[in-house]
């Protein structure tokens, strides 16, 4: 080891004992490092003196170690700053930390090896180790530089991506803000619409309740109208049957009158013929008598005077008055039946015919549904105390309403402290007699049906009244019961009493 010629390379501008570490550091030329070498203007030459001062060599080694430590610290500091500013991938960070750790371990190994230099004999060997170590460190630093450049590029890309991400986040935040404001406006608008809808629903609910009440009322009215129509149909059915019977009787009477009229017409024709013949005979007799009278008068006048010749014809006289119509001629044969003519206008209504006989009493109809109980009226004032022994008042009281006088009108009966009418089913003159006698009249002159004196209001107390005619009160007559009826007020009965 001592015979190996190793020299440090220096330029001719440097001092002879200056260290090679004072040159600019070139990592690519470390492998060509020569120790204790002098340079001439023309060529290199080795020193013949194989001794390089031990003190200068140790100083140079110490300077190299210090420079290496400073370089390593600066590299580590730069890497820490680069790593602190970025969020590179964990694999590259691990590789970088591994390289730094390895570099630190090699530096510690170098320090330990330098501290354990035993003597001048081992100096050249240590220098060779240092040269190889520098070479290894140079390669590692070059790789570290490449990794640092890649890391910087990744940091730039990461920064650009971070800026793009920041812009995207800002745009997303603006979009979210717009969506939030729009959602708030939509929520407010939706709340207003829901409030208005709730109000409309409440109004519709109130209207539906009102309509339900109206429908129930209308249904009740329709039921009442149905009962009224049934009653009216029942009554009209009886009246129609009576009218049909009367019409049939009238048709028979008309046929009989037609036959009688034809017979009388034939008789009249014969009488007219006889009168015409007798008038002709009478005219002939009258002419003969006039001629006889003229002859007698002329005979009396011509007793002494002879008749001269006739004078000239006189002027034509005036037309005399028309004589009476002649006697109609004989009836000619009946001609062919002509075509049916156009129907003429409806004639005036004829007089009401006489009331027909009462028909048989019909069957009692089904009992109607019970009506709704009315509200209780206010309590009346307390009346005066009556006599202890008073006359018994009859339960039924009768009155005549809406007539031309107290002797006629619609019959109303007082029952249960309420006035009500009487239905005209089977209403006849006997019933009217009882009512008129109750009112102090001698009897009934005429009875009336179908609301002749107007339609009453309230209840219809009595129906199917059948009096014998000798009762003192109408409530003693037979009837269907108080308030039991299938009639309407169009069938209210009336009466006209004898005054």
UniProtKB/Swiss-Prot annotation:
Gene Ontology molecular function, alphabetical: ferritin receptor activity
This protein's record includes keyword Transport: yes
Domain Collagen-like: 307-359
Region (Disordered): 305-392
Superkingdom of origin organism: Eukaryota
InterPro entries: Collagen (IPR008160), SCARA5 (IPR034726), SRCR (IPR001190), SRCR-like_dom_sf (IPR036772)
Subcellular locations according to the entry: Cell membrane
Keyword Lyase tagged: no
GO BP annotations, alphabetical order: endocytosis; intracellular iron ion homeostasis; iron ion transmembrane transport; protein homotrimerization
GO CC entries: plasma membrane
Cytoplasmic-facing ranges: 1-63
Residues in SRCR domain copies: 398-498
Glycosylation sites: 99, 136, 186, 233, 256, 302, 402
Bias type Basic and acidic residues, positions: 357-392
Main location: membrane
Membrane topology annotation: Single-pass type II membrane protein
Transmembrane segments: 64-84
Keywords: Cell membrane, Disulfide bond, Glycoprotein, Ion transport, Iron, Iron transport, Membrane, Receptor, Signal-anchor, Transmembrane, Transmembrane helix, Transport
Extracellular side: 85-499
Listed PANTHER family: DELETED IN MALIGNANT BRAIN TUMORS 1 PROTEIN-LIKE, SRCR DOMAIN-CONTAINING PROTEIN
Family: Belongs to the SCARA5 family.
Function: Ferritin receptor that mediates non-transferrin-dependent delivery of iron. Mediates cellular uptake of ferritin-bound iron by stimulating ferritin endocytosis from the cell surface with consequent iron delivery within the cell. Delivery of iron to cells by ferritin is required for the development of specific cell types, suggesting the existence of cell type-specific mechanisms of iron traffic in organogenesis, which alternatively utilize transferrin or non-transferrin iron delivery pathways.
Subunit record text: Homotrimer.
Annotated protein name in UniProt: Scavenger receptor class A member 5
Organism: Danio rerio (Zebrafish)
């Amino acid at each position: 080891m001592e015979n190996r010629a190793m020299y440090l390379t220096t330029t001719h501008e440097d001092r002879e004992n200056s260290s090679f570490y004072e040159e600019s550091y070139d990592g690519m030329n470390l492998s060509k490092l020569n120790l204790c070498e002098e340079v001439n203007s023309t060529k290199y030459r080795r020193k013949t003196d194989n001794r390089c001062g031990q003190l200068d060599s140790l100083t140079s080694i110490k300077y190299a170690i210090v420079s290496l430590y400073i370089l390593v610290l600066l590299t580590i500091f730069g890497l820490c700053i680069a790593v602190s500013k970025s969020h590179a991938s964990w694999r590259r960070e691990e590789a970088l930390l591994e390289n730094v750790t390895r570099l630190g371990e090699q530096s510690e190994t170098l320090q330990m090896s330098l501290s354990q230099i035993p003597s001048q004999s081992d100096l050249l060997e240590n220098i060779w180790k240092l040269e190889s170590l520098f070479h290894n460190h140079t390669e590692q630093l070059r790789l570290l530089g490449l990794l640092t450049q890649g890391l910087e590029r990744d940091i730039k890309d990461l920064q650009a991506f971070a800026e793009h991400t920041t812009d995207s986040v800002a745009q997303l935040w603006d979009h979210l803000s717009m969506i939030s404001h729009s959602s708030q406006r939509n929520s407010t608008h939706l709340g207003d619409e829901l409030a208005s809808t709730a109000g409309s629903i409440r109004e519709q609910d109130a209207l539906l309740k009102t309509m339900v009440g109206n429908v129930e009322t209308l249904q009740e009215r329709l039921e009442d109208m149905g009962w009224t129509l049934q009653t009216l149909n029942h009554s009209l059915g009886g009246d129609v049957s009576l009218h049909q019977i009367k019409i049939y009787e009238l048709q028979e009477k008309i046929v009989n009158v037609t036959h009688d009229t034809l017979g009388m017409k034939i008789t009249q024709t014969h009488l007219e013929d006889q009168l015409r013949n007798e008038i002709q005979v009478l005219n002939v007799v009258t002419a003969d008598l006039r001629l006889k009278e003229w002859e007698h008068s002329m005979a009396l006048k011509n007793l002494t005077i002879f008749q001269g010749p006739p004078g000239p014809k006189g002027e034509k006289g005036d037309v005399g008055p028309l004589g009476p119509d002649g006697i109609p001629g004989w009836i000619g044969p009946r001609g062919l039946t002509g075509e049916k003519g156009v129907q003429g206008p409806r004639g005036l209504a004829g007089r009401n015919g006489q009331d027909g006989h009462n028909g048989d009493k019909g069957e009692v109809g089904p009992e109607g549904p019970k009506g709704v109980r009315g509200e209780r009226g206010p309590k009346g004032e307390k009346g005066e105390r009556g006599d202890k022994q008073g006359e018994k008042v009859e339960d039924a009281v009768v009155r005549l309403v809406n007539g031309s006088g107290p002797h006629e009108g619609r019959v109303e009966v007082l029952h249960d402290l309420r006035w009500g009418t009487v239905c005209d089913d089977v209403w006849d003159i006997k019933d009217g007699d009882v009512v008129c006698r109750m009112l102090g009249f001698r009897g009934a002159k005429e009875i009336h049906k179908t609301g002749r004196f107007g339609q009453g209001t309230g209840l219809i107390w009595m129906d199917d009244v059948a009096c014998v005619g000798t009762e003192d009160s109408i409530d003693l007559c037979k009837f269907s019961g108080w308030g039991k009826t299938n009639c309407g007020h169009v069938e209210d009965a009336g009466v006209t009493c004898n005054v």
